[in-house]
Structures are given as C-alpha cells and as structure tokens.
Amino acid sequence: MSKTYLGVDIGGTAVKLGLVDENGRVLRRAERSVSFDGYKTPILDTVQTAIREFLTADAPRLEGIAVSATGQIDSRRGVVAGTCGNFPGWIGVDIKGTLERAFGLPVTVANDANCMLLGEVWAGAAKGYTDVIGVTLGTGVGGGILTGGRLLEGARGLGGELGHFRLHALDGVACTCGAIGCYERYAATTALVRSAQKAGLDAPDGRAIFEAAAAGDARTLAVLNGWINEIAQGLAGLVHIFNPQLILIGGGVSAQQALLIDPLAAQVRKSIMPAFAEGLEVRAAALQNDAGLVGAVYYFKQQQ
C-alpha cells in the first residue's frame, strides 16, 4: 500500500495542507488564512484547527506530518529560531513538539525556501540535479542550496538564508533584520516596485511593471533591467562559492521567462568566470504552490 504523508506549508498569511504520496504527488489540498484576525489567534493554533478539519474520518493512515515554515527554522529541534517578518509570537514556537503531542505522529520542520528547493529536486524542475541554488523572489528573498545531493543546513539547520547576505554593506538600504544592504532589499519583488515608484512610474505591484515592460515601455524596461542586474550580482557570488549545475528561480515572477529568466541567465553568465558558466543552467521552478508541501515531505522522508 502506498504511503501517505501530511504536508503543511505555513506562510506569513496562510497555511496550505496537502496529502502527499510517496512519489511526491499531492492527492488533496486545502488552505486557510493565519492572519484572518491580525494574528490575535496564534498561528500554530490556527494550523492545528486546519489540520483537524482537513483530516476527515476517511483520511488514509499517515506516516507523519511534514512541515514547511516561514522564518529561521531550527530544523534539528523543529523550533522557530527567528524571523524578519511581523509575525507576533512566532519566535520560539515549538512546531515539532506541539504537533507531535496534538496528533501522535512524527513531525519534521524545515524552512519554507529549503522545502521549495527540495520539492523541485524530488518532483520538479531540479529533478536529477545534485548541485542547485534555489532562490524564491517575493516580498522577501528565500533560498536553499543543494550541494553534492544534500541540502546545506549548517549547525542548527539555519543555513541557506540567502536573503540576508550583504550585497551593499557600506551604503545600502536598511533591512528589517537590522542590517544594511541585505540581498532581499535589492532582489525581492518589493524592491522592484520601490525602484519603479522612485523612478516616477505607475507601478502598484510587480504585475503592472511586467505588463508595462511587455508593452515595450523604455523607462519600465530600464528599471526592470536594473533589478535583474542586482539579482544577478548576488547570484554570481553564490555561483563562485558553490559551483552549481542549476540556478532555480521561484516565486510568482518566475513565470516571466522572456522578461526575467532569460535576461537573468545572460547577466549571471556575464558576471562569473568562464569556467563557472560552463554547463550552468538558469530556469524557473515548476511546482508553484505545491513546492513547499512536496519538499516538506521529501525532507521528512530523508530524516527517517
């Protein structure tokens, strides 16, 4: 009989749930807001309620609960070690212990960007690759690094926090983490919107910017290319450290092949030494909203 796992993807505004089989297929899905009352209800309380409602009487026997979670996750203990977002009461939450006591099942917890990468490695655009840098572009920048077929986690499972290496340390923009010049302040889609508005463009969001760029607006294209260059410079440094086969771009903007992925690939190759460019691929993630669920389950399977 096929094994089934419960994947739980806890984000800043919603929790996604999915029954995932042993081949990485999502059999059933659900989603619930975690910010519906301004976080007055603790996030993990909302998650537990969502799980109980999701696991109906006819649900299959589960091997365990695999959690992908926003924030700096101590994956060794399954605890939230830190966060740069405005999530009241999230730091210090024992996700693993709480869910194991509540549901009587083994639980693993990993960072959401790491899970995105693992999902793509198991069942998506990075399948078959052993050395991959995964970057998720959104309101911030998340990242994961696969080297020699293994996820780079570090001593406490906190490794791969790509959004907070210092791209412009001396004269950069202040970051929510308290530092200056962090990568996500230049590479996130919010940075693109900020740059467009600073240039006097009508740019309420990233979608509007890409629509204007697709229409050939020269000022918008100049802002977009500047943003792509910032992303590329950060990736170039990572390429020289990790020598990946593949750079994987996730987030909603990754669907912009002609306006983002193709020019980004070209700019990265121009910014690195020739030996590192040989065979290097840059492509969009494939699993979209399922990546965190699938990757969390893959992480669970690896820990057993």
Predicted regions: what is each one?
Residues 71-73, 86, 113, 157, ...:
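Short, flexible active-site-adjacent loop segments at beta-strand->alpha-helix junctions, enriched
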